[in-house]
Amino acid sequence: MSDLITDLSRRDFTMNAIALSADGMIADPFDGVSDIAKRTIRCVGEPKLRFTEDALRMFRALRFSARLGFTIEYDTMQAIEQCAPLAAELAPERVRDEIEKILLTTRPETMSAAISFGLMKKYISGAGWKTPNFADIADMPRKALTRWVAFAIMLRKYGYIPSARDFLMQLRLDGRTIRCCADAEVLLSQEPPRDDLGWKKMLNRYGVDTVTCAVQTYAVIYGIDREKELKNILKSGECFSLKHLAVTGDDLLALGLKGPELGEMLNFLLEYVMEYPDNNKREILLELAKYSEES
């Protein structure tokens, strides 16, 4: 039993320092069961010592609070504020993984606490001119890509970071998420599409994931929902990319087109079909390609 108690004494929080002994009895030397009943997150022993052993435990405390709806006990919270500078020594990948887990909970606003405690100072250079309402992120689909993009762009908009893209790169996010965020940031600086053709051109240039993220982030930041318009375009089945075009490069090769001419013709036909969606038919497009080539 003494070995078990020693092992439990090294755990992070009391709720995680509960075990069954060899004789089937519950070993709970730090009152973890009681803390669970009180919905409380409390460090095992001296909080500063636990956080000095592994600074990631500070993020874990916030993550458990976000996921379970538990309250962080006063001494533990005070220790997080005092030990926050230790978070700068953590590998970005470890910090990234904890942030993502928080963002994917029903309480993403917990990231405001991480920022105010100083856990993010290595990545957030500014004080910000307004506190982002990260709680709104909970209304977005529970997808890592979507929530990372919204989180980074909100930080950028309110002056906490100079670049959403660079912020995600610092945290070692994957290339797809970084590209999506950079493009979504560009889209948010532009006027929204005014018609179906505008939506299709945007989808063609940036892709479904990026446009969807931008639209959902736009709703979170500005309170204006344009997602219905986007969904209508996607449900319509109208062509906005070469993969939806009724003809392929092989079809145009058969007409004698090759090299740059073939690519130019495909793009011409795509532009035509985006404007006249009912004409996305193989026969019509082949005839148009022949006519255009002859003229």
Pin down the residues of each PLM region:
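Hydrophobic, well-ordered secondary-structure elements that form the walls
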Residues: 185, 252, 256, 276
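Divalent metal-dependent catalytic cores for phosphoryl transfer on phosphate-bearing substrates
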Residues: 132-224
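Short arginine-rich
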Residues: 189, 294-295
